[in-house]
Amino acid sequence: MDEVGVLTALVEEYSPSGHEGDAVQRFIEVSRSLGFTAHADAVGNGIARIGEGRPSIMFLGHIDTVEGRLPVRLDGDRLHGRGACDAKGALAAALVAAHRHDGPGEIVVVGAV
């Protein structure tokens, strides 16, 4: 899955505050497709891990959005949709960067509810 595919997959899931469950499941599916181990923790946050050992680095972004559905569309090199830049865009960037990282250590990406 390329960068645009990762972002599109996350943005396509509607996730207004308090109703993030489906978006967390999508985050987990996307993470696993990139080679992460991933699960939801006890409060519903999506936790994705790749690599092992030290150093350990964590990226955290919120997965909820404001209410109101917007159509997801690609317009040239811009993806439009709820959460594309706040903060699903940052989560997508963290997942792709961690997936491509070939150095030592563990990277944890958290999609917080």
Mark where each language-model region is.
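N-terminal helical capping/dimerization or prosegment-like subdomains
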Residues: M1-M58
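A general secondary-structure junction signal
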Residues: A42, G111-V113
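Active-site metal-coordination/substrate-binding segment of hydrolases
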Residues: R54-G111
